[in-house]
Curated annotation (Swiss-Prot):
UniProt-annotated binding residues for heme b: H62, H91
Name of the featured protein: Hemoglobin fetal subunit beta
Domain of life: Eukaryota
GO BP annotations listed: cellular oxidant detoxification; hydrogen peroxide catabolic process
Disulfide bonds: none
Function recorded in the entry: Involved in oxygen transport from the lung to the various peripheral tissues.
GO CC, alphabetical: haptoglobin-hemoglobin complex; hemoglobin complex
Gene Ontology MF term list: heme binding; hemoglobin alpha binding; metal ion binding; oxygen binding; oxygen carrier activity
Length: 145
């Protein structure tokens, strides 16, 4: 999946990520850009506008939780299916989340990282992160197959 150099680059950049901020922004952007995903978060209160979503403390808290799980997965880049097995089961069997949403969230995360890290987020680093988020999305969708 990733070369040793790519793993090192991804790990190095992710060590600088402010999980609470990036997670909240990524989930918030997902809900704004892909509004049909809001149906999974109806209990979060006001999701009526971009400002409401991005300022919603429940969105921020859940975004942090999502990114914390992503960080744990980064520790097991060679076994993403194993790392995300229980979350795949939860999202498939209990929450019935469309697995396409995992890919969408991964792509939004890449956008947020590019926005926050600017020129440091080189095309090569983006390519490495894209491999990671694709791997995570596939691992989360594994239970669906």
């Amino acid at each position: 999946m990733l070369s040793a150099e790519e793993k090192a680059a991804v790990t190095s950049l992710f060590a600088k990520v402010k999980v609470d901020e990036v997670g909240g922004e990524a989930l918030g952007r997902l809900l704004v850009v892909y509004p049909w995903t809001q149906r999974f978060f109806e209990s979060f209160g006001d999701l009526s506008s971009a400002d409401a979503i991005l300022g919603n403390p429940k969105v921020k808290a859940h975004g942090k939780k999502v990114l914390d799980s992503f960080c744990e997965g980064l520790k097991q880049l060679d076994d993403l299916k194993g790392a995300f097995a229980s979350l795949s089961e939860l999202h498939c069997d209990k929450l019935h989340v469309d697995p396409e949403n995992f890919r969408l969230l991964g792509n939004v995360l890449v956008v947020v990282l590019a926005r926050r890290f600017g020129s440091e987020f080189s095309p090569e680093l983006q390519a490495s992160f894209q491999k990671v988020v694709t791997g995570v999305a596939n691992a989360l969708a594994h239970r669906y197959h």
